[in-house]
A protein has these predicted regions:
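Short alpha-helical functional segments enriched in proximate histidine and acidic residues
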Residues: 60-64
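Active-site-adjacent beta-strand/loop module that shapes the phosphate/pyrophosphate-binding cleft
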Residues: 72-107, 124-129
Length: 129
């Protein structure tokens, strides 16, 4: 299903969970005290949620997403979550937004200090495994 963002829809966001073997990519936003997040961000007016995800991932971590699987959304904040297993490129951080990244095991990722949005998406992912 394709959702198109229109004027007034300011809280919609797309977040991607990059998976490599049993690892997941988490990122630390620039200026965040200790919280980690997952790549992604706000969807612009006129973009589909997938287009927003592709753009945000390329901007934040320099990875060109090739294929995604839609996982679901958080009803309260309109955050859409995707599983990403195919991409091109190497990680290149946009330091204005992301200051560092880590590949962490899926079975320990919830032990990290995560944003609420990241925690909800990762928990949704773990519930499907």
């Amino acid at each position: 299903m394709k959702y198109e963002i229109k004027d007034g829809d300011t809280s919609w966001a797309a977040k991607g969970m990059f998976l490599k073997d049993d690892l997941i990519l988490i990122v630390k936003p620039t200026g965040s005290k200790h919280r980690y997040d997952i790549p992604g961000g706000k969807i612009k007016i006129g973009e589909s949620k997938e287009q927003g995800l592709y753009r945000e991932c390329l901007e934040e971590v320099g990875l060109k997403v090739k294929k995604v699987k839609y996982l679901g959304k958080n009803e309260e904040r309109e955050k859409h979550y995707f599983i990403i297993k195919q991409w091109d490129g190497e990680i290149v951080l946009q330091l204005e937004e992301i200051e560092k990244y880590r590949w962490v095991p899926l079975d320990t990722v919830l032990q990290y200090y995560l944003t609420k949005t990241a925690h909800q998406g990762i928990q949704m992912l773990l519930d499907t495994i």
